[in-house]
């Protein structure tokens, strides 16, 4: 396994599968590819973002229409980004030139320029922290010898061991599915305040007088919002939820559809009665549409679109605003690989999140090598989305947009390799991964 992500670096790992295909005498032998599938995954990246997983899938368990899934996961992501919660995240990026207080301010900034500017040292103040011997101190007097950097201003680390269990029942020849389950997780949050990190001398960099090197990271955006009382969950905590979803699915081929629709509605509830540290609920609706307008002219030309809207209500910890449970996969905060691809992952999160994508998938060449079949698809796409503080004020204005071009390689039909390049007003990103964006 290998991928490339502009935020997490180059990923590498291995997944080992085990199958029980059942016997030909089984009543469901012709309807399912296996009776039991298990896999173990190790995955890391060059920036140490880790995704490890054990997964069990049992279709038609005990010769019934029920399907059971269980997953144990451990994610450790020191690359996690935080820009705030709610409509405030829709504001353009700003920073001072060379990160110096009192210097001209850049508004409507580019992410890459802001990130590189935050690496510069600036004079520290009494409110800036410093970590010594594993303890965090503040109140250091301002002076020429105390410099800090904002290199990690928008970053934190979250470590999440998690257990997911779900059961699924199909109706009407599989077009309707009822899904229910639970999630148990412990979310361990580490901030970068006061940690010594690499920095750049704003004046003498590149000269013998340069003072570049390790200095304390100043107060982060996450800490600022916690101290201002804007967020919950600064110290992490347990999130245990029960969830239920209903699906209507007429896609002709799930990994790479030519036609059909996929509609889902889900509800997820966290409660202290099931040992969660937080009480909240989430509502999520998601629709995907696939249509081949000229099947007699093009071997494969598909108009693909999807639209989603979710609400997180109650005492929601900040790290949960970025997760909306879908029956096929979790939709993360807007930005990154699957939504608004021209923006960084979790660039926009809030109580209410709306998003959509339009794609044109055109197969322009296919060939075989050593008995393996490959099909090349050109995919122009357009993403849009935004967040709201109040779902009742959701509308059709002030959306963020990104557009781009993708190359999708279908390998023996079911495996899709994606290479997407996306552009927005704020950033440019290249992704290499597996499966379609939706």
Q: Across the structure, where does each feature detected by a protein language model lie?
A:
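C-terminal outer-membrane beta-barrel translocator/porin domains of Gram-negative envelope proteins
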Residues: 207-214, 219, 224-235, 239-369
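Hydrophobic, lipid-facing positions within transmembrane beta-strands of outer-membrane proteins
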Residues: 12-14, 50-54, 159-165, 240-244, ...
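Short sequence motifs at beta-strands and strand-loop junctions characteristic
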Residues: 6, 46-48, 153-159, 234-238, ...
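Gram-negative/organellar outer-membrane beta-barrel architecture
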Residues: 1-234, 243, 338, 422-438
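Short loop/turn motifs that connect adjacent beta-strands in outer-membrane beta-barrel proteins
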Residues: 8, 22-35, 61-68, 172-178, ...
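Transmembrane beta-strands of outer-membrane beta-barrel proteins
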Residues: 36-40, 66-72, 176-180, 242-244, ...
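Transmembrane beta-strand segments that form the barrel wall of outer-membrane beta-barrel proteins
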Residues: 1-4, 26, 30-44, 52, ...
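Sequence/structural signature of outer-membrane beta-barrel proteins
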Residues: 5, 19-23, 39-47, 61, ...
